Every structure is written in C-alpha cells, then in structure tokens.
Amino acid sequence: MFAKAFRVKSNTAIKGSDRRKLRADVTVAFPTLGTDQVSELIPGKEELNVVKLYAHKGDAVTVYTSGGNPILFELEKNLYPTVYTLWSHPDLLPAFITWPLVLEKLVGGADLMLPGVVVPPTGLPQVQQGDLCAIALVGNRAPVAVGVAAMSTAQMLASGLKGKGISVLHTYQDHLWRSGDKSSPPAIAPLDPTDSCEEKADLGLHGNLRSLSLEGEEENGQVPNPEASDDPNSRALSQDSVDGKPLQEQMDELLEQCFLHALKSRVKKADLPLLTSTLLGSHMFSCCPEGQQLDIKKSSYKKLSKFLQHMQQEQIVQVKELSKGVESIVAVDWRHPRITSFIVPEPSLASQTVQEGSREKPYLPPDIKSLYCVPANMTQLFLESGHKKGSTLEGSEVRRIITDYAKRNNLVDADNRNLVKLDPILCDCILEKNEQHLVMKLPWDSLLTRCLKNLQPAYQVTFPGQEPIIKKGKLCPIDITLVLKTYNKKVTVVRNLETYGLDPCSVAAILQQRCQASTIVSPAPGAKDSLQVQVQGNQIHHLGQLLLEEYRLPGKYIQGLEKAPKPGKK
C-alpha cells in the first residue's frame, strides 16, 4: 500500500476527545495490550497528530503519529500498527517468519507467498482469514511488515503451503516508514533459540510436518488434547517400542531411507557442492513416506552432522566445511552398493498429484526481436502504409515500406536503378539540415540504413506460452560487473535479470549454493522497480555457466563475461 509515495491531505494535532476515542479503539483492536501499554502508545499529554492521506492507488488512509513516527494507520475503519509500534510490542500480532531475501519483494509491493514462509518449531501461528498478522525475518523477532491473512492456518496447511499467505499493507523501508525517523529494526532474539542453524532447519521443517499431521487428525475428527503432551505417562509411552522395534532404531532406519532416497532420485551431480541443510530441508524431508515424520533428534545420531559423518565413514558421501561453520556435501559415490541396491518406494497417488502440481517449470529463454518505432518527424513517410506515430515495425517491414514508397512515387532513378531520388518527405525524414540542398539521390542501401537509424529503437520479448511484450527503447543486456571493495575484496554484481524473465532472488539462491558465497538482493541504483544481485568474490564463471549453458540465453544479451577469472587464478 505504501510501496510508492502517498499524497498528504492534512496534518493536524489530535483533539482531546479524539485521543480518548483512539485509546478506546486501540484497546478493542488489540486486547493483548495492557492499560499501561495503551497509555504508553497513546500518551495523554504528548504531541499526537492525525494525518489524512491518499495512497498511490487512491485509498484514503488516516495515520496517527507520535514523536514524529507513524504509530498506527486506519483503513476502512480498521486499525493497523506500524513497524515502529511493533518493534516496541513484537508480540502484538501473530507473526509469520520469512527469509531476509524476501524482504526486498515485500518492500516492492509484493504479498507474502506461502513457499517463502519458514515454519518454526512450534508450527505456524493460528490465524483466521482476514486476521491481522506481522512478518518477521529468520533470527530476529522484530516485525518488518504488517498485513492480513489471505487464508486461515488450516487452509495454509491443507494447501501444502502454496499460494498467497499474507496480503501485505505496510513494510519496513516503505514510504510510511520513511515518514518517520527511518530507524532500523532492533535485534530481538527468538523466544526459543536453538543451538545451531542445522537444528533450526530440522526443527522448522519438523514443525511444519507436525502441524500438517495435527491438522489431518482434526479433519478426521480426532482433536488432539494439548494436556496429554505434558503428561509424563504419555511421554513415556512415546518412547516405547513400536512394531517390536525401539523408536530410536526405527528413526535411524527412516533417516537412512530418506538419505538414500534423496541421493538416488533427487540430488544430481550439478547440485554439488550441496549445503547439508539444503539436503535435509529440500530433499530428505520430501522423501519421507506419507504418514511418517522424520525427526533427527529422536534418532541415535541426534544431529545431522553426526549422521553425515557416519555416511562419510561408509564412503557414500564426502563432507567438507567450505566456509566457517557451514558444511557441504562435495562428492557422492553413486556407485556405492547402498545407493545402487536401494529401491525407491512407489509414491502414493495423492503425493504424486501434489508433486506434479508443485513442480517448478524449467526456465525457457524468451524469443527477442529488435523493432523500430515511428517517431513524429517520420510519420508522413509511413502514413500511406497504414502506420502512425508510435507504431512498431520489424526491420524487414521497414525495408518493404520504403521500397513500396519509392516505387509508388516514381522515385527510382530511370538511368541508374540503384539510386533513389529524394522527394521532400524523404529529405525531411533522413537528411541532415546541411544536406537538404546538396543530396538529391541516395543508393538503396544508404537510404535504408539512414531510415533505420532515424527510427526509434524498440524490442519485443516473447516468453513461451505467453503474449508478446513490446517495449520502447534499447534492450538492456544482463550486466555483470566486478566491484572492488575495501581490503581488495571483490563483489560480482548482476543487473537486468527481470527483462529476461529471471527472478533475482532465485538466481541469488542458486549462486549462494554453487559458489558457497554470501549473496545480497537489493534495489538497482538508478533503475525503477529493478533489483540487482551481489555475490561475494569473482563469480562470473559460475554466472556464465548458469546463464549460457543452463538458461541458454544468447551471449549477445550478456555483457561482462570477459571479466571471469582466468584458469589457474582466483
């Protein structure tokens, strides 16, 4: 809502009666706030202003400011807290967690899609469709966005975490935030921090599976008893043997099954080096049989790193710490008897349907054509052929129109048919002022070259299965530059990916995995609604492989590949 600049209608100090009414409205809208907290938010004597404004789409919004910062905004008689308020009261709204890379999309006006939601150990917050929600980033409880739930928690889980999760209204770094002191989110530690990133990935994904399991029980009429989980007897029962085998032994078998299944059917050589957390989160959990839950903490290994050490001792995989504290699988022996003898279980019909529906379509490069746009000063030349100012034409069409015009007006020289006589219209369209009375005839190739040069550039981009997109101006290639930072550190910067249908966040995630380097997605300087990807180090060689070999983009649409490190150099 505030991704673009808004128009202020009025800004006045609040009246005493309106202040009391606002305090009462806040108490009703946010019942979790105590009396003291409401008084702190809506002080009795400090300056409090009411700002009436129109958002860029025309919505009438009332904003309440205190101490120069917007604290609340009202839309269609509903009150919403701003991020400034949520930083003081981080638990005011149920919060959904997402990755830092997603923030750029939210700031640009996008809604939060469910595939970008990180499920915490406790599962997703319980909300109904239309409930107010906050959005926070992994590792920090300070909210960075406010929105409305697009569906209930039950619907989110039933959808397999696909589709729109939250309709975003306001974010950190948007224009409403900019109207305040522009402070950054405070660092607020998670309520239940874990010891390592590995455990976070394990617990987060396990929490998602646990939530899905509980939702299934509710749908079957079996409502779980929350008190039962706290009963010592029930905890003891959970450790008893099942089907004659201890639970720990069963979890060890399930862990190995998911591991071998992932290596045999999901992980490819091109994926290496592969972060161990990615192996667990993106491959092993999805290989878990329907109706079962993979929980490493219930296995004898307790941690993924210990399990992978065991698999390395069996010479199935090779694990290395490519960067400090981050382990990756760098090699897999796909000829190992444990992998070759493993039989991939047949998926159920339901899981097959889900997988087919959720499978991402491979990237296909667009078909790109250079076009020419008719400017105002050349309109007369193209009117007879039915074209007007702003019409776009291919080069072959321009040649045909010029040829027809010359023949129709008897401009071809009778003595030398390679020459074309210039009439007043052609003179005005293609000659310079100092040539007007000097040049009377031109060869065909010179005439056509001059005509194409004076037309305005345009281009057409057609993605497979979509309608063509025509844009005026020159086509900007994917621009790769190498920037030298302090202490001689290099950063690879990529721009203009969106023109070719590439998502900067997706490209950044791929480069982060393959280069084992940190990546940042940020607004491109001087470019409206465009993002750039920064990768630590000289990663132009990896970029070239991705863009040319995998995405199959023609090299003429990529500039900067010559800056790739030479063989034998870093």
From Swiss-Prot:
Keywords: Acetylation, Cytoplasm, Initiation factor, Phosphoprotein, Protein biosynthesis
Record PTM N-acetylmethionine, positions in chain: 1
Chain positions with Phosphoserine modification: 238, 241, 348
Location within or outside the cell: Cytoplasm
Limits of the SWIB/MDM2 domain: 370-454
Domain SUI1: residue ranges: 478-551
Any GO MF annotation of the entry: translation initiation factor activity
Domain PUA: from-to ranges: 93-173
Chain segments carrying region Disordered: 178-200, 215-243
GO biological process, one term: IRES-dependent viral translational initiation
Signal peptide: none
Domain of life according to the entry: Eukaryota
TM annotation in the entry: none
Similarity field: Belongs to the eIF2D family.
Name recorded for this polypeptide: Eukaryotic translation initiation factor 2D
Organism: Rattus norvegicus
